[in-house]
Amino acid sequence: MATRCFWCWTTLLFCSQLLTGFARASSAGGAKEKGLSQTPTWAVALVCTFFILVSVLLEKALHRVATWLWEKHKNSLLEALEKIKAELMILGFISLLLTFGEQYILKICIPEKAAASMLPCPAPSTHDQDKTHRRRLAAATTSSRCDEGHEPLIPATGLHQLHILLFFMAAFHILYSFITMMLGRLKIRGWKKWEQETCSHDYEFSIDPSRFRLTHETSFVRQHSSFWTKIPFFFYAGCFLQQFFRSVGRTDYLTLRHGFIAAHLAPGRKFDFQKYIKRSLEDDFKVVVGISPLLWASFVIFLLLNVNGWEALFWASILPVLIILAVSTKLQAILTRMALGITERHAVVQGIPLVHGSDKYFWFNRPQLLLHLLHFALFQNAFQLTYFFWVWYSFGLKSCFHTDFKLVIVKLSLGVGALILCSYITLPLYALVTQMGSNMKKAVFDEQMAKALKKWHMTVKKKKGKARKPPTETLGVSDTVSTSTSSFHASGATLLRSKTTGHSTASYMSNFEDQSMSDLEAEPLSPEPIEGHTLVRVGDQNTEIEYTGDISPGNQFSFVKNVPANDID
């Protein structure tokens, strides 16, 4: 409730600053402003009513969106929305500080020589300087006169324009985030037809283990291996061009799907890989909509370096495009290297070629590094587009900021192109290729499985209590869950990949959030139980609990016996 109230207040503040700026602009000609004591009460009430209605409607709209996401179990998108609201609050808080500190900022005077240095536009002529000086004196109604040879640190008009920039950043951040997510989901929606093909007899025939083929004759290897892959320059040049013409094809999707299921699920298990990729994209979107302190620092650095003649605006527009192209090329190169890896391991394959993913394919063995680079590129690109429209609104389309208008058109085109390329191609490609890393993402677990595993965890703690273990002992950081099919650390959200032959979804994460829409095609209210023999290592007592039976939300878990770790093969 406090967050909602603060957001309303900051929205009111933004609107009031807009009105204040318009009033200052209209009174800059020299007419003396009247205070509230000389203003009709109906005018004050009318303006306040308008601002209150706008603020409440905006807050209610965001609240309705959050409620809809919660009802649809879109947890990742709900967290992304909360991040956006938090960032809007930060912008509102900055505006609040500027408003209450305006009278003190206007009293700060600096020498004229310092005020004439590092200007974003060319210095005005003498006639223009006199005209500008008279305008500043007329507009600075709340400031005190500076001494001779000194000027205000930021004039009142400049503070108002800074408020407008913050308002544009808030509005365009919401719009930019919405476009990014919609384009990514639109791309992944096109993969649904490929997922439906996996239920056909033709697909069953293609993955039949009794069907042997030469490796170099498979579609995946043919598309990604050729004479140019043996020469480094042509290798990366081909990967660079592929992102524009064929970023993800049907063969790529089906091959990576087959490799993921073979590594993490039981043979023959039905799994909706397209839904899983969509949820994985939502998790990635939750990251890229945030504004970290590092991104705020880049915003301040750009404002500092935006000096006339330095062409900082041009380089800041080029940088996001270069980063997005580099990341897309790297992702295409990973697909090609996985295809080459198949040819190096096998001369003959059974059914669909089995790809083996690893973090070694990514820069510094860190798949998340690519996402952080995309996060930085998206923020910079969004800010450049926002900056263009802010300059257009505040100074005009052909102002001193846009001395070369043709170059401005090129930069604007690059910004829009980078938005489409990253949202429609790079982010969906990242969500698909990173499934071939060494770690399995938590989005693989459906909601019913997550509840079953949490219940299993509570049962383990109860059993430990009955066994007279210390009450503070839990499945903590040092605990690991060992199964007959996969193993990973139980303390976090990272799941280690391992080659498996059985169920690997019977795993636990202590900080796991419920996910929506089961990927496993089972009954919605009665998910298929997980059968198997499970060993759970508890604490540092070097003991293991043996569990045999089914794991399902409705079952009670029974732990047969406590077996010393050294007695288990």
UniProtKB/Swiss-Prot annotation:
Any one GO molecular-function label of the UniProt entry: calmodulin binding
Keyword Transmembrane carried by entry: yes
Segments on the Extracellular side according to the record's topology features: 1-41, 107-163, 308, 394-413
InterPro entries: Mlo (IPR004326)
Bilayer disposition of the protein: Multi-pass membrane protein
Pfam families: Mlo (PF03094)
GO BP field: defense response
Annotated stretches, region: Calmodulin-binding: 447-468
Localization (cell): Membrane
Positions in coiled-coil regions: none
Sequence intervals crossing the membrane: 42-62, 86-106, 164-184, 287-307, 309-329, 373-393, 414-434
GO cellular component terms attached to this protein's record: membrane
Descriptive protein name: MLO-like protein 10
Taxonomic source organism: Arabidopsis thaliana
